[in-house]
């Protein structure tokens, strides 16, 4: 009896703690004097309800028909408590389908948490836009650009395409933006007027939207700043982040003028703090759905979303319902080194990647800035999404009839695996596509995308189908620490029905999971074709006891596969926290795709080299000093570095055995220049004093050996390029793997001289 009483007390205590946590989360909300309601009777019914119940009718919410926003005549502007009695009176009205009091939402701008084409344009910062042009000194260096120039050379520059940036405003009178500014694609939802001009303050906090817009549409050849990816497109700004953000404001922004705007670019989302789980509210979700169904005269709005900057916080973008949406194209970042940056998040919903900032030694992104200024320090996935939006604008100029799903297929089929190949995590799915949780299907390639979109050859993808798979007899399954729940899901993918699916696009696993510590859960889904995808990785900072309620975990990793067969879901907790417990309450698998294979997928994807030299660190070994005679078989240089064949080298480019020969002069100068905090030199490097090059090669390779030992890393999967493993912090304050290598070289130089 005593044991049972003690057990009941413990259970009561756990429930009390959960109740406190839930109410604590709610207590942080700030409710505003606005109510959203769905009223099928139209404006007349909405006006009548407002008059009868003491509201002012503020108007329709964005493009959502029969959805209206009300303001109560006798309620404070803000309150920590919801006005439940007012909401109930409104929702109980027979003319109202649904009603909700609006509350403030925390939204974070996704900038980083730290803060031969050279003569093509006369814009002063054009030669710093390394991601748009091939700025290599020699062919041995990695090719970095997004293949935009070949598209421009076809005369495709974004003409006739309208992009709007959902952010903190747009300095539309900026010299490098004004010629391309479109007031019909602009609005200020913070102040409810048609001018999205940002609010100035001493810290220039509201520069984000102007920078994002500049990346897309900076004017070319006007002697100002740089050049936008789609420099003849039209750009607008939606000011919605510089004030209270509610579901109604988000819906109005996402659904603004969808008959005129082609592409919406958003570089924000819920907090990237490693513990938030949040997605679009009811209204924003409906705005997404309306956009893809009605936007662009029925072809569908293109929504481009930055994948998030919570990498350092251990965040996972599968907990962000905006990037996790089937309606958005989620874009991640790659650094100038071709690596996953320190801020990037991993998730199964990321579709593709463009460039952005990396470590402090890497160059960043150039754009327009507040006060008619320019910047070369735009950072984070915030900078990646607008570059993608600009590339999509080029595709829409080439083929205005592309649907929103056509665009996603084009991205999947043309993104490049090769330039990012030396990062861990790549896998080939059952349709032969290379995919990675860090990068999606790879680096965007503007030329390949626009070429495939050619209206003379492109065939629009078949009609979208949706097949829901669930077990009506499923009983809740318990899960505890160090435990595992395995669910086998056999499916015929609605075979024989109108919604049968033979070629997959998105896959959603919708589940309600109750758990005492949400961040300890790990969810993996294996497709019928054998592709294993992490839908949720552990998040150390997420201590919430709230679990997941009808949450959609979305994956693109099985794109193109035939779904027929048995899928396997694994939900585990390997944290070792013995007090953890919970249960899987319900689930369903939602398959999105087509009943027939899209035309462009009837032949397998063929991956070709993105660059003539493999795009990794080993490229520098073949680099030749431009000022020196190149070695030939007849006249070999004594200092040429020769490595063993791949069969005698260890994994990850480590050299266990190397033939004698000192490192090349060019290699050392490249490494030394890269270690500088300044931007890399734009001219050919001058010859260094010969004394600086007299380095015992044994020491050099010893340094390489120590710095590349996988055994020092905690996670074997990430042993090659996990740049931020905590174990390294104990010895050196350098956060980037290359920094440690370069510092070792500098130490050798100092010792020898």
Swiss-Prot record:
Sequence ranges assigned to domain Peptidase S8 in this UniProt record: 129-450
Entry's Gene Ontology cellular component terms: extracellular space; membrane; neuron projection; secretory granule lumen; transport vesicle
Keyword set, alphabetical order: Calcium, Cleavage on pair of basic residues, Cytoplasmic vesicle, Disease variant, Disulfide bond, Glycoprotein, Hydrolase, Obesity, Protease, Serine protease, Signal, Zymogen
EC annotation from Swiss-Prot or TrEMBL: 3.4.21.93
Enzyme class: hydrolase
Biased composition (Polar residues): 630-642
Any one Pfam family match given in the protein's UniProt record, by short name: P_proprotein
Record PTM: O-glycosylated.
Catalyzed chemical reaction(s): Release of protein hormones, neuropeptides and renin from their precursors, generally by hydrolysis of -Lys-Arg-|- bonds
Gene3D superfamilies cross-referenced by the UniProt entry: 6.10.250.3320, Galactose-binding domain-like, Peptidase S8, pro-domain, Peptidase S8/S53 domain
Maturation propeptide residues: 28-110
Molecular function terms, GO-annotated: identical protein binding; serine-type endopeptidase activity
Family membership noted in the UniProt record: Belongs to the peptidase S8 family. Furin subfamily.
Role summary: Involved in the processing of hormone and other protein precursors at sites comprised of pairs of basic amino acid residues. Substrates include POMC, renin, enkephalin, dynorphin, somatostatin, insulin and AGRP.
Protein name per the record: Neuroendocrine convertase 1
Source organism of the structure: Homo sapiens
């Amino acid at each position: 009896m005593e044991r049972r009483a003690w057990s009941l007390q413990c259970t009561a205590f756990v429930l009390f703690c959960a109740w406190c946590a839930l109410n604590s989360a709610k207590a942080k909300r700030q409710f505003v004097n606005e109510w959203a309601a769905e009223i099928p009777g139209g404006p007349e019914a909405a006006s009548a309800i407002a008059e009868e119940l003491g509201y002012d009718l503020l108007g329709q919410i964005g493009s959502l028909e029969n959805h209206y926003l009300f303001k109560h005549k006798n309620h404070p502007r803000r309150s920590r408590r919801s006005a439940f009695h007012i909401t109930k009176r409104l929702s109980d009205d027979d003319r109202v389908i649904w009603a909700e009091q609006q509350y403030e939402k925390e939204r974070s701008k996704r900038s980083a948490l730290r803060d031969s084409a050279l003569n093509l344009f006369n814009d002063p910062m054009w030669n710093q836009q390394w991601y748009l042009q091939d700025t290599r000194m020699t062919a041995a260096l990695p090719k970095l650009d997004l293949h935009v120039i070949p598209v421009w050379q076809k005369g495709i520059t974004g003409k006739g395409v309208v992009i709007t940036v959902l952010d903190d405003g747009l300095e539309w009178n900026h010299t490098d933006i004004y010629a391309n500014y479109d007031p019909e694609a602009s609005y200020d939802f913070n102040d409810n007027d048609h001018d999205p001009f940002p609010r100035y303050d001493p810290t220039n906090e509201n520069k984000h939207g102007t920078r994002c817009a500049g990346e897309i549409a900076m004017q070319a050849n006007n002697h100002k700043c740089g050049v936008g990816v789609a420099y003849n497109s039209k750009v607008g700004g939606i000011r919605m982040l510089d004030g209270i953000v509610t579901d109604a404001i988000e819906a109005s922004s996402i659904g603004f003028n969808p008959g005129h705007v082609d592409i919406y670019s958003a570089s924000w989302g819920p907090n990237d703090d490693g513990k938030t789980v949040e997605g679009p509210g009811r209204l924003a979700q409906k705005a997404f759905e309306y956009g893809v169904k009605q936007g662009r005269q029925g072809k569908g709005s293109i929504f481009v979303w930055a994948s998030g900057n919570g990498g350092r916080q251990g965040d996972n973008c599968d907990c962000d319902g905006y990037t996790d949406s089937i309606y958005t194209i989620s874009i991640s970042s790659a650094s100038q080194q071709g690596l996953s940056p320190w801020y990037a998040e991993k998730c199964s919903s990321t579709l593709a990647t463009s460039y952005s900032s990396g470590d402090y030694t890497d160059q960043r992104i150039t754009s327009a800035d507040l006060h008619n200024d320019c910047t070369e320090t735009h950072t984070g996935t915030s900078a990646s999404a607008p570059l993608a939006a600009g590339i999509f604008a080029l595709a829409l100029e080439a083929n205005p009839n592309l649907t929103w799903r056509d665009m996603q297929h084009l991205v999947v089929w043309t993104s490049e695996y090769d330039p990012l190949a030396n990062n861990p995590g790549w896998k080939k799915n059952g349709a032969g596509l290379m995919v990675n949780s860090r990068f999606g299907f790879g680096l965007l390639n503007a030329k390949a995308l626009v070429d495939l979109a050619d209206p003379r050859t492109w065939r629009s993808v078949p009609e979208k189908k949706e097949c829901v798979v669930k077990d009506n007899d499923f009983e809740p399954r318990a899960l505890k620490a160090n435990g595992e729940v395995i669910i086998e899901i056999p499916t015929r993918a609605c075979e024989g029905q109108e919604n049968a699916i033979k070629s997959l696009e998105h896959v959603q696993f919708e589940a309600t999971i109750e758990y005492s510590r949400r961040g300890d859960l790990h969810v993996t889904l294996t497709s019928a074709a054998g592709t294993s995808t992490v839908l949720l990785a552990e998040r150390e900072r997420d201590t919430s006891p709230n679990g997941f309620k009808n949450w959609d975990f979305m994956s693109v990793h099985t794109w193109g596969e035939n779904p027929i067969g048995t899928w396997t879901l694994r939900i585990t907790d390997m944290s070792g926290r013995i007090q953890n417990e919970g249960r899987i309450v319900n689930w369903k698998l939602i398959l999105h795709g087509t009943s027939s294979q899209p035309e462009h997928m009837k032949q397998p994807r063929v991956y070709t080299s993105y660059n003539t030299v493999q795009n990794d660190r080993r490229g520098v070994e073949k680099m030749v000093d431009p000022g020196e005679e190149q070695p030939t078989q007849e006249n070999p240089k004594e200092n040429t570095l020769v490595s063993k064949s791949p069969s005698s080298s260890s994994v990850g480019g480590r050299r266990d055995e190397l033939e004698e020969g000192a490192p090349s002069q060019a290699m050392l100068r490249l490494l030394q220049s890269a270690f500088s905090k300044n931007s890399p030199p734009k001219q050919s490097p001058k010859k260094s004093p010969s004394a600086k090059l007299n380095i015992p090669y044994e020491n050099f390779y010893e340094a390489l050996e120590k710095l590349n030992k996988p055994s020092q890393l905690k996670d074997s999967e990430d042993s090659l390029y996990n740049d931020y493993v905590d174990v390294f912090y104990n010895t050196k304050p350098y956060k980037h793997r290359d920094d440690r290598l370069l510092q070792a070289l500098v130490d050798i130089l100092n010792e020898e001289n």
